[in-house]
Structure formats: C-alpha cells, structure tokens
Amino acid sequence: MSVIFHENPGTSLGSVVPDTNTSFERESQLSVKTSPEWIDELFPNVSFIDSPTHQVIRGFCRDVFVYRLPGGFRVRYWDAVILVPNILFLLFLILKCGSVIRKLRTGNSPVLRAFTLLVYVSTLVNIIRCAYSMTLSMTDGLEQTVDQTLWIIIKFFYLTAEFCALTFGLLFGHLDNGKSILIALLGTLLVSIPHTAVQVIIEMKIIDNSWLPLTYFDIQSDGGFLFWVFSSAVLALVYFFIMCLPLVCCQKYTKLPSKGSFLIYCMMMVVLNVLQSMGAALILFKSSDGLCFVGVSTYVYFVLYPPIIYFTFLRKKLKTPPNNTSGLFMYRKHKDEQGSGDLPDSYYPRFSGLTSPSYDDLFDYDRDARFTHYDISRNEYVQNPHYNTYSTPLIMTSVETAESTVTTRTGSDDYAHHRDSMLSEPSTGTTTRHLKGLGPQGSLVFEDDPSSLTSLRM
C-alpha cells in the first residue's frame, strides 16, 4: 500500500490543487468524461465505456479525495470517512482494555503482546493522522510537508504491522520469548524501512530528476505510480505464496497456521494488493477508472486492517480463560544434563492418555468388556461370575516402539484373545491386587508383593 494519488494533497503528496473539477483534471491529466484511446481499442463494443453512468462513477471516485464537507468546514470527505470507523474501533478497544490487560498479565505469550501492541498503535496513529489533516489548510508549504510526513508514518506502521503479522503467524511455534520477538521485529524492519525510504525519495522529491529521461521512472510524473504498481504486485505474490505453502513440503521448516482465519486474512490481502496494483497501473496510463480501484482498496485497508488483525489473531485468544497448566503439555526439546547436546526425540516418552478426562480412562480403559460377557441364552451382556476373583493386568503395556512407554491395545486381536482367555478360566481364588507404583524398568509394583516393595524403595 503506497501513495494514493500523487496530485492529491489530502491523501498523498504533490502540488496543491484547488477543489474544482477543471483544475483537478488539468493538473492530473485524468478526464472523467473520456477514456484513453487504448481502453476504447481494448473494449470497442462495450457501451458502458464513457456512458453517463460511467462518468458519474468516475466523478464520485475523484471528488471523494478532494471535496470538503459543506457548511464552511475544511474537513475532507476522505479524512472523515476514515476517521469515524477508526474512532469506533478505538472505543471498542478501550472497552476491551481491562480484559486484555488481565489476559496479558496472567498469560505468558510474547506473540500475544506483540499483536495487541500492533493493533492499538496502528489505530492510534491513523486517528492522529486524520485529526491533524483536518486542521491543515493545505495551502501552506510547511503544513503540506507535515501532512505528507504523517501519511508516510502511517503507511510505515501499517506495512510493518503486515510483515509482523506474517512473521508471527508463520513462526508462531518458534517465538517463545521476548528475544525471538525482537529478532522477528528487526527482520520486518529490514524490509519496511527500505520501502519507506524509497517512498520518501519519490514523494518528497529529494533527488533531482533533471538527469533522468522522460520515461516511466520520471520521479515527478509517474515514478510514484510505477513504484506503487511494483510494490503492490510483490506483496500480492507474497501473500499468494503463503496461501500455497500447505501444498508444498515445508512442514519441517515452519509450523503453518492451521486456522482458516489466517488463510482468509491472506486472501483478503491478496485481493487488496491486486486492486491497488490495478488501480495504480490504470492511473499510470491516464485512465481515471483507476481512482475507483485505488479508493476502494485504500479505504478498506486503512479502515479495516486493525480490526482484521484483531479478529484474526486476538479475539479467540483473548476470550479463552488463562490456563496455568498449559505449560505441562508444551513441547520443548530437552537438553542433556551432561552438556552433550539435545537428547533424541525417542528418549522421553509421550503419554497421550494424560489428556484424557479422568484417571480411570487411562488405567481402566475397557472396564465393561473385562467384567461382563455375552450370554447367548439371555441375549444380553451379564456380569462375569468371576468378577474380582481373578488376577488380571491393570493395563497392557508394550515396548515395541519408541513412541511411548505405555501403549494401550484397545481393540487389537491380541488383547481380545487375552481377555477371552481370562474370562473363560475358572477362579483361582486370588483376590484383587492393588497397584502401589512403578518399579525398575517400568515394572508394576503391588502392595502384597514384598520383593516389589523392596525394589520400589531402591
């Protein structure tokens, strides 16, 4: 998202233009009544081209940038329609401020803090820019320079927020402390600062262009639009490539967001940047139709981008209650105590059963099947007559894989055969054995086994 219109003093940079149609068309060389010859040649049989309706649409897209509110106010329509939604969203953020602060204090997520800061800062800077622009007469050179500077600042903040959102979204699993967040932020600044520097050079006319040929790279005429077309097209390709990442083999390098909201966010940014690039290209070739593409995409960008960030990355996270035990199930590669390096993944076990709702679900996973049998004569399941009179393992274990030290065999053929054999055996007179704990090498220790108790103490 770069300049809006290089001859529009209220939205970007350029010479001051009076609020009249004739002056605007003469200075900008964009006519709302006729289309360029290349459009007539491209669409020779389209009656909508240069029709009265088409001229009205072109005129509206042009007037909204420069016309001011009636009643003697110096406020432009463009500033007003951007300011009002941002103020409403800021009021919404203020109402949510208490819950946001509590969530940030109880949680330990630097990414959440970074996203929250991006939303609040972007909204405040946009409101300050709109409010200050309303007080400018735009006829004084100093005030015009201040307005230009504010537009560059707000676009710098928004571009930085874009790259931060992409970085945090794609590297969420790797950003677990403030240092990693700072490194990611510095990486985004390496892209946004050069982009803004080129904008400053073009819009402030810092470089003397007398030595440049009169081509599309002429800074005073079309250089800004060419840069706009190129930057918007590159951003659209970046977002489109990110949308295609789940289709390529890159899962081992980055943890891609699985939420559909992130893909919707990328899709919206692709559409906005494509519209920006198309609009700038049309204006570059002297077609006033580009003003409509530019106006719609720019308005959506400066009004809806902070809310999009909030509802995509923050809303669900801020609504969830703090969970102090979530750190127990966070994956973190263990370090060897002797300092020899990382331990292999198969060294430490993973107990998927720990996430079950109750303790019995882990250790007594097939209770009904073990203590009942099917009676053919009665055509129903009845309690086993040898209930609590036979010895049975508390849980089936397996060390066949390094994936876990405890592996249930629910539903397997071996377990079904073992269960049926136990149910068919007569009672041996043994009583229920109570589990005391785990002994060496994962063996089960029972209360009535003295040798096992001795090994447990060891």
Swiss-Prot record:
Highest taxon listed in the record's lineage: Eukaryota
Q: Give positions of region: Disordered.
A: 409-458
The Gene Ontology biological process annotation of the record reads: G protein-coupled receptor signaling pathway
Q: Name one GO molecular function term.
A: G protein-coupled receptor activity
Which locations, inside or outside the cell, does it occupy?
Membrane
Q: Which PANTHER family match?
A: TRANSMEMBRANE PROTEIN ADIPOCYTE-ASSOCIATED 1
Q: How does it sit in the membrane?
A: Multi-pass membrane protein
> Its GO CC terms?
plasma membrane
Origin organism is Caenorhabditis elegans
Alphabetical keyword list: Glycoprotein, Membrane, Transmembrane, Transmembrane helix
Regions crossing the membrane = 81-101, 114-134, 152-172, 181-201, 225-245, 263-283, 291-311
Q: What protein family does this chain belong to? A: Belongs to the UPF0359 family.
Biased composition (Basic and acidic residues) is annotated at: 411-422
Gene that encodes it: tpra-1
Protein name (Swiss-Prot/TrEMBL): Transmembrane protein adipocyte-associated 1 homolog
Q: Which residues are glycosylated?
A: 21, 45, 323-324
